[in-house]
Swiss-Prot record:
It comes from Yersinia pestis. This is Peptidyl-tRNA hydrolase. One of its GO terms (biological process) is protein quality control for misfolded or incompletely synthesized proteins. InterPro entries: Pept_tRNA_hydro, Pept_tRNA_hydro_CS, Pept_tRNA_hydro_sf. The keyword Secreted does not apply.
């Protein structure tokens, strides 16, 4: 079993970004809170929106930073330091260009794949990359020069449905991760592919 104490959903703040692909991590955390009859509330000392859940018998904090994506580490480090949470007790949910919509994958540690949110979190955690990541597939525009516009764009309804289905399965697999550990959660989540 994995002892995750903090689950973070990455996003850009403000209504104009709420429905953009880059905010997929926050969609997951918001839905996770909602499923447990909680809602995130602004907590300025953590530079973000927070909630507290009992998940699989474990006390877990949720966080969606209110900073821009490339400054996400400020909120994560503030909360981790206050509650004495180690990098390996953190799960960060984020949008992933290298995975198709309708799929999501879990991993521990590794690179940041050019994701500015992950980059800043690793930086602010003392350059420690050993935190869990939930990589929510958004697909790739096919051309590197189009990436910024793509992640800051809204997915069409057909893709949104696929992303939502993958987030739904990710929430079920979060309980598996907490109860039965990383291998079981990965095996289940990585076998999932939403169909249109």
């Amino acid at each position: 079993m994995s002892s995750i104490k903090l689950i973070v959903g990455l996003a850009n703040p403000g209504a104009e970004y709420a429905q953009t692909r880059h905010n997929a991590g926050a969609w997951y955390v918001d839905l996770l809170a909602e499923r447990h009859n909680q809602s995130l509330k602004e907590e300025s000392k953590f530079f973000g929106y927070t909630a507290r859940l009992n998940l699989a018998g474990q006390d877990i904090r949720l966080l969606v930073p209110a900073t821009f994506m490339n400054l996400s580490g400020k909120a994560v480090a503030a909360m981790a330091s206050f509650y004495r949470i180690l990098p390996e007790e953190i799960l960060v949910a984020h949008d992933e260009l290298d995975i198709l919509p309708g799929m999501a994958k879990l991993k521990l540690g590794g690179g940041n794949g050019g994701h500015n949110g992950l980059k800043d979190i690793q930086n602010k955690l003392g350059n420690n990359p050993n935190f869990y990541r939930l990589r929510i597939g958004i697909g790739h525009p096919g051309d590197k020069s189009k990436v910024t516009g793509f992640v800051l764009g809204k997915p069409p309804a057909s893709e949104q449905t696929l992303i939502d289905d993958a987030i739904d399965e990710s929430i079920r697999c979060t309980e598996v991760l907490l109860n039965e550990g990383m291998t079981k959660a990965m095996n289940r989540l990585h076998a999932f592919k939403a169909s249109a």
